[in-house]
Amino acid sequence: MGNRGFLGEKSSENILDVAFSHPIKMIVNALGVPPLRMLELAKEKNVTCGALVGTTQQALKQAESGVDIIISSGTEAGGQCGEISTMVLVPEVVEALKDYDHVSILAAGGIVTGRQMAAAMAMGANGVWTGSVWLTTEEADTAPSIKTKLITTGSNQTVRTRSRTGKFSRQIKSPWTDAWEQDTAPEPLQMPLQSLVSEPALGRIGKLAAVSYTH
């Protein structure tokens, strides 16, 4: 890890070395084409390499880089997300990559139920990629109060905001996100600088939420 938790080139390579020293089956990259070293190690060790994308242009770049799986992630996704809905993005990516026979396509973004999985495959995806739903499982180490929040929050109670990382991410609406939406609020900093502002405060909020603190 670099200063304040950000990754430099050398520390990133060290983390890749650690990851590939274990018997992993798959490794996934986001926010750009995977580093060449990641692609080389994946091929050498027969590890499936995936990439998250939010546009057809990104999907084409990733396919040309040599990844095995494209995860087509719509704006409904929790955490970092793009601007295009899953329903629109998945068939666009499927069409754009029709000549890349070696690449499998997974749909992501707001997918939880079997019906949603079936719908994704009806649009041409080979399967789905799910994330937030696993935070609510018995095996997850998510704090009980956070699990309850995730389960009871309605689909109309999330917002797409830059207030945490500087890039748009989907979060549960909260006083924190409300404050950043005020006319008097400053513009969030670009990634990764916004995390220097947000993480100390959100870290404390998370610890208090874990013990069901209310004020």
Task: State each model region's role.
Residues E83-L106, V112-Y213:
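Conserved active-site-proximal phosphate/metal-binding subdomains
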Residues M1-D101:
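Active-site entrance/lid segments in N-terminal catalytic domains of soluble metabolic enzymes
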Residues G8, T214-H215:
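Intrinsically disordered, low-complexity regions enriched in small/polar residues
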